[in-house]
A protein has these predicted regions:
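Active-site hotspot residues in diverse enzymes, especially metal/ion-binding acidic/histidine motifs
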Residues: 1-273
Length: 273
């Protein structure tokens, strides 16, 4: 099947991406934001009544098309992490790279491309080897040795996986099916009882003192303060627009930053005084 062929080359595509960075830990977690910021302009802003966790778009900036990604920081950090990985897949053109590697002329429908990008994000954030290893370690930590366990104990393991990889419940549920840790039937059972399970997830997440549900409400675009300073000094925007940007992104004036201080630095790197 074409789907199986596409899935089979995702690890190779991920390795191509990782080769651009010095990533010691295969578990990327919230380092994904820094990686995304190297590939596009990222806007972090909370929209509390918006269901969407984020999106990718392109805009012309000085006659050049630039990639923009919006991350809704009103969502829990775990959802922000997976959204960042998903949107990185769009920015990096993962679907085209995958189709190129399997040498096919098929065109993906929008839903199929989203499904493929979700799989890329899952494999990027939850590499199979590490995901399986931690699953069995977490089972051992809870002294679970039998294949037949109470659903309460199994949800505890899922929450531990969520915390290890900093991803939401649904991502872990799907990944467990993808890595053959649970069957399709068990995956459907977990999906069917989602409201009951989400209550358990929330309770166990608090019990483990995780940050999975933390809502950052961050308002920024990396480098925005320096850009605003340049615009202000060069009078490149009218006062009203400039004030609105500062207000929308909570940019306060910092006094005393022009003060010169005399610092004493010890021996230099080459040993000279």
């Amino acid at each position: 099947m074409e789907w199986d062929r596409m899935i089979s080359v995702i690890p190779e595509v991920i390795q191509d991406l990782k080769s651009e960075y010095t990533l010691i830990n295969p578990m990327i977690r919230d380092d994904i934001f820094g990686i995304l910021e190297k590939h596009c302009i990222v806007v972090y802003y909370p929209l509390f009544n918006e269901k969407n966790c984020g999106f990718h778009t392109k805009r012309f900036i000085k006659d050049k098309r630039e990639d923009f990604v919006y991350i809704n920081t009103a969502k829990p950090i775990a959802e922000q992490v997976f959204t960042a990985a998903h949107e990185l897949g769009h920015v990096w053109g993962v679907a085209d790279k995958i189709l190129s590697k399997i040498d096919t002329n098929i065109r993906l429908e929008c839903d199929d491309e989203e499904k493929l990008i979700n799989r890329f994000a899952a494999e990027l954030l939850m590499p199979e080897k590490e995901f399986r290893n931690l699953f069995f370690l977490n089972m051992k930590e809870l002294s679970i040795v039998d294949n037949k366990i109470k659903i309460e104990d199994f949800i505890r393991v899922i929450v531990m996986q969520m915390n290890d990889f900093m991803v939401p419940y649904e991502s872990v549920r799907r990944r467990m099916v993808e890595t053959s840790l649970i069957t399709e039937e068990v995956g459907k059972l977990l999906d069917k009882n989602v409201e009951f399970i989400q209550a358990l997830v929330s309770a166990f997440s608090k019990d483990l003192n995780t940050i999975l549900d933390n809502v950052t409400e961050k308002k920024t675009i990396p480098g925005l303060r320096a850009l605003v300073d340049q615009i202000e000094q060069g009078k490149l925007l009218d006062e009203y627009t400039l004030c609105k940007v500062k207000k929308d992104f909570d940019i306060d004036s910092i006094l005393g930053t022009d003060t010169i201080i005399d610092i004493k630095i010890g021996d230099s790197a080459d040993g000279e005084d």
